[in-house]
Amino acid sequence: METLCPAPRLAVPASPRGSPCSPTPRKPCRGTQEFSPLCLRALAFCALAKPRASSLGPGPGELAARSPVLRGPQAPLRPGGWAPDGLKHLWAPTGRPGVPNTAAGEDADVAACPRRGEEEEGGGGFPHFGVRSCAPPGRCPAPPHPRESTTSFASAPPRPAPGLEPQRGPAASPPQEPSSRPPSPPAGLSTEPAGPGTAPRPFLPGQPAEVDGNPPPAAPEAPAASPSTASPAPAAPGDLRQEHFDRLIRRSKLWCYAKGFALDTPSLRRGPERPPAKGPARGAAKKRRLPAPPPRTAQPRRPAPTLPTTSTFSLLNCFPCPPALVVGEDGDLKPASSLRLQGDSKPPPAHPLWRWQMGGPAVPEPPGLKFWGINMDES
């Protein structure tokens, strides 16, 4: 039972654990701080992802987000000169990471803001950053210019309270997107602060910052004029192409086979409403076209044949073989055929006389006797 039931895990760890990326200050180590490759990769990813997050741009009434600067004893990471270029502006070189150094932290806080200004001072773009500011730790003086540099968003620490924000002029434009502004202003752009009645206009090729909320007057004129002038032109060819496509489909052999060659459209019915052909048919279309039927002349119908008033039908005449006996007038049977004819009357058509051969016996002889050649008359 002891092996099946594992020891219960404590809900709260016995000893507080720090971040997996930060070393625990258990032993005051002397020398260069060591970090794992995974920690370095995570730090680099965070440093590269923070400026990209601000590239989405603030809203019309919002302030641009700034990346925080780790300072003082709150910063668990105090790397030396080994940090990559993307991370140098986040930390300042200090003493031992294990032992908190308040004086070094204050010096780093004071030097964090003007360091970028000194880099910009070399180019002559922003002279107000060249002055060393002795502000209390954790706070940088706000520049007198209402327009702020892009690098100040990444290097300056977050302002502790919004009370310092009203220093911006009421006529100043809202902060623009940091990613859309170049790191250093062009050579021809003046750096004097704008007057109280004018708003600073950044030098941009397409002026996307100006047209963020209200497009320039020239832009709406072009779309307004384009639908009225260009809409009828493409509409007519589209209708013609669609009509031509429908005509080809309805005249195709596959369509005709599917419809059972039912001419369901007025243009396909053969009649006076059919439009005349534009030109002589070519190729297979000429073979499929049926010639026009010749005009039919009104011919008089043949007169009905005159039928006899009395019927000439006789059952004995149509009988296959002449009967031997028939019923007489007295109701008795009598021979059907007789050679005793009265006067010049002819025997009936079914009389065997008409079947006799000339020169043969009047009474047909049996086939056996005829075959033997026996003559009954002679016997």
Swiss-Prot record:
GO MF terms here are: chromatin binding; protein-containing complex binding
**Its domain of life?**
Eukaryota
Q: One GO cellular component from the entry?
A: chromosome
Q: Which UniProt keywords apply?
A: Chromosome, Methylation, Nucleus, Phosphoprotein
Asymmetric dimethylarginine modification, residue list: R52
Q: Pro residues compositional bias: what residue ranges? A: 172-186, 291-306
One example of a Gene Ontology biological process annotation: transcription elongation-coupled chromatin remodeling
Return the Low complexity bias intervals.
221-237
> Where is the PTM Phosphoserine found along the chain?
S15, S19
Matching entries from Pfam families are given as: EPOP (PF15223)
The annotated region (BC-box) lies at 39-48
Region annotation (Disordered) ranges:
1-27, 72-105, 137-244, 264-309
Region (Interaction with SUZ12) location? 311-359
Query: Where in the cell?
Result: Nucleus; Chromosome
**Domain note:** The BC-box, which mediates binding to the elongin BC complex.
Instruction: Describe the subunit structure.
Output: Associates with the PRC2 complex, which consists of the core components EED, EZH1 or EZH2, SUZ12, and RBBP4, and various combinations of accessory subunits including AEBP2, JARID2, PHF19, MTF2 and EPOP. Within the complex, interacts with SUZ12 (via C2H2 zinc finger domain); competes with JARID2 for SUZ12 binding. Associates with the elongin BC complex. Interacts with USP7.
Per the entry, what this protein does is:
Scaffold protein that serves as a bridging partner between the PRC2/EZH2 complex and the elongin BC complex: required to fine-tune the transcriptional status of Polycomb group (PcG) target genes in embryonic stem cells (ESCs). Plays a key role in genomic regions that display both active and repressive chromatin properties in pluripotent stem cells by sustaining low level expression at PcG target genes: acts by recruiting the elongin BC complex, thereby restricting excessive activity of the PRC2/EZH2 complex. Interaction with USP7 promotes deubiquitination of H2B at promoter sites.
Its protein name is Elongin BC and Polycomb repressive complex 2-associated protein
Q: Which gene encodes it?
A: EPOP
